Amino acid sequence: MELPIAQFPDVQANRPKIPINLTRVGVTGVKKLVEIKRKDKRPIVLISTFEIFVDLPSDRKGANLSRNFEAMDEVLEKAINLPVYEIEKLCNDVAKSLLRRHEYATRSEVRMKSEYVVKREAPSTKMKCQEVVDIFAEATATRLEDGDIDVKKLIGAEVVGMTACPCAQEIMRDNAKTALRELGVGLETVMNFLNKVPMATHNQRGRGIISLEVSGDVDVSLETIIRIIESSMSSSIVELLKRADEALVVERAHQNPKFVEDCVRTMAQNIVSEFAHVPDSALVTIKQINEESIHRHNAFAERVALLGDLRDEIKNN
């Protein structure tokens, strides 16, 4: 004898007491194991944290949150079976799936954060080590009037490096010049010394952040973003350093002093040169945060612009 199937009431579909729209309803802190396959390379395995939202119309009491997990798991299983997959593509597909499952929603958002391990080597001894980079991706899907779904996707990274202050270095350079002249050292010898040996200055641990938001099937290389950020500061940093490596890192940083503003401008220039295939409509966000060593405050600089505007500025200046 078959038992009757129980029909449970859909409480979420009821009309709320206060009928107003909600911008975001969903779940946060969702941890998932994500396997990103790469062509001719070993897959990348990430433990990722997701935020998943849809908008909610005024005539619904709540959203069916279980559908968020259904959409996520469906796309993750699909990703495992594909030869190549990007994290922004993952968010893109989840955002689309959310709108298909939440028929009452007109907008969905998916945000993903992970720690990505990259291989590095010490500059002098060439010893191998691993560095951890924070990566993130987002996708926002909008249901159009004709029923199609438009998606904007974003990918970015945050990388830690080192900067040396140009201002304090010039002060120390001037002090060294005066002291050497008072000791009777000739001016030509003093200038040769100062040009060869970088002067002391205070340092910062810098955090560079780049994100690019694009539409359609435009690919943005995460590895390129990471490389641009690393090269924008006075020096990259390495977890494992022997004495020879440490001396070289410090020397490099002091030979390449940079303000927080310099880092952002360098990143902007390199984005323009490295991402020639990305359309002008891409939204670029560049940030640099330098944690000061001799102050309690941190230094900050940012540029937000369309890629086309950055191209015009750099070309015309």
Curated annotation (Swiss-Prot):
GO molecular function, one term: GTP cyclohydrolase IV activity
Keywords: Hydrolase, Iron, Metal-binding
EC annotation from Swiss-Prot or TrEMBL: 3.5.4.39
A single GO BP: tetrahydromethanopterin biosynthetic process
Keyword Metal-binding belongs to the record: yes
Cofactor or coenzyme needed: Fe(2+)
InterPro entries found in the cross-reference section: GTP_cyclohydrolase_FolE2/MptA, GTP_cyclohydrolase_MptA
Site (May be catalytically important) residue list: C165
Note on cofactor: Binds 1 Fe(2+) ion per subunit.
Pathway note: Cofactor biosynthesis; 5,6,7,8-tetrahydromethanopterin biosynthesis
Annotated catalysed reactions: GTP + H2O = 7,8-dihydroneopterin 2',3'-cyclic phosphate + formate + diphosphate + H(+)
Family indicated by similarity: Belongs to the GTP cyclohydrolase IV family.
Assembly information from the UniProt record: Homodimer.
Entry function: Converts GTP to 7,8-dihydro-D-neopterin 2',3'-cyclic phosphate, the first intermediate in the biosynthesis of coenzyme methanopterin.
Protein name: GTP cyclohydrolase MptA
Source organism (scientific name): Methanococcoides burtonii (strain DSM 6242 / NBRC 107633 / OCM 468 / ACE-M)
